[in-house]
Regions:
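Conserved catalytic core of sirtuin-type NAD+-dependent deacylases
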Residues: 1-264
């Protein structure tokens, strides 16, 4: 399998069924794997943050999500066509995340890492809830809502998304309406480009360094725990199979079955 930084692929639907309840024997087996692991990796996806009130990328598009297609906004073409709309959309998402709190799942991962310093966290999420729970994150595969750079010269930019005056309005229709059509700032380094979100959009290359760190960790781990990821978006969906190929145990924690489920 090629370890070079790949391109974020468009999602393709897969058939999923409700996962069966985990029996006590399986729970005991997972506990034993966790207790014995010295180099575990937690690979987290959007489901990890759903209990914090952050909608998953593919949640039913009701309310606000009916107004805009997330897939259509998450492209370079969308930013070039309407930079103010895309910029406002991502600032709104960052403000919503800022008003949310880590959930017990984030806390459990952070506590496990304190007990097992060799544990690495690799996430597909663009929020900062793992960090706010106290975990050290090895790689944000798809970037971060809280990092920005120039769309032309690539220079990093320090941009504060701000917070709603009332945190209860974060992620609301009113907060989005207040932010829509805010133009992105100009780059202070080159003076020509616009500042864009530090997110990996569909069709873009994943940042090489985070991908290389994640790939190396999965090749070297003795346990991979996959939490809340649909297994749809490549290349991140291939990482558990890297661990399997290297002889590691893989545990999947998901409310539905994925393409990985039949292999673990």
């Amino acid at each position: 399998m090629n370890a070079s930084a790949p391109v974020l692929a468009d999602p393709h639907p897969v058939l999923a069924a409700s996962a069966p309840d985990l029996d006590p024997g399986a729970l005991d087996a997972v506990r034993a794997l966790v207790a014995a692991a010295e180099r575990p990796v937690v690979l987290s996806g959007a489901g990890m943050s759903a209990e914090s009130g952050i909608p998953t990328f593919r949640d039913a598009q009701t309310g606000l999500w009916e107004r805009f297609s997330a897939e259509e906004l998450a492209t370079e073409e969308a930013f070039l066509a309407d930079p103010a709309l895309v910029w406002s959309w991502y600032r709104w998402r960052a403000r919503m995340v800022r008003a949310r709190r880590p959930n017990p799942g984030h806390d459990a991962v952070a506590a496990w890492q304190r007990r097992t310093p060799g544990l690495e966290v690799v996430t597909q999420n663009v929020d900062d809830l793992h960090e706010r729970a106290g975990a050290r994150v090895l790689a944000h595969l798809h970037g971060s809502l809280f990092e920005h750079r120039c769309a032309d010269c690539g220079a990093p930019a320090d941009v504060d998304p701000g917070a709603p005056a009332d945190e209860a309005t974060a992620g609301s229709e009113a907060d989005l309406e207040a932010m829509l059509r805010e133009a992105p700032p100009a780059c202070t380094v080159c003076g020509d480009g616009l500042i864009r979100p530090g997110i990996v959009w569909f069709g873009e290359m994943l940042p090489a360094e985070p991908w290389d760190r994640a790939f190396a960790a999965l090749e070297d781990c003795d346990l991979c725990v996959v939490v809340g990821t649909s297994g749809i978006v490549q290349p991140a969906a291939s990482l558990p199979f890297v661990a399997l190929g290297a002889g590691a145990a893989v545990v999947e924690i998901n409310p539905v079955e994925t393409e990985l489920s039949g292999a673990v």
